């Protein structure tokens, strides 16, 4: 369980803060989401991406969101 909490932590990549998360689907399974934010105050920007694969567990969804968010932040 401790590793799962580590996977949920915000990650700093350059000027971006990557926040992976999961959300339960009403029909079962989980969605993977990631928030990528930058800036401060009035100049802050937050992008939220929801990915199409359905996951069997919240942990798997968070792992996927984390990997995708890190890849996006490193590419930008």
Give the ranges of each region predicted by the language model.
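Short arginine-rich
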Residues: 67-76
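N-terminal segment of the canonical double-stranded RNA-binding domain
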Residues: 1-39
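Structured alpha-helical
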Residues: 63
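Short acidic, glycine/tyrosine-flanked loop/strand segments centered on an H-E-D-like triad
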Residues: 40-45
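A short, exposed loop/beta-hairpin motif centered on an aromatic-Gly-Thr core
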Residues: 46-60, 68
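A short local loop/turn or secondary-structure capping micro-motif enriched for an aromatic residue
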Residues: 27-29, 54-55, 73
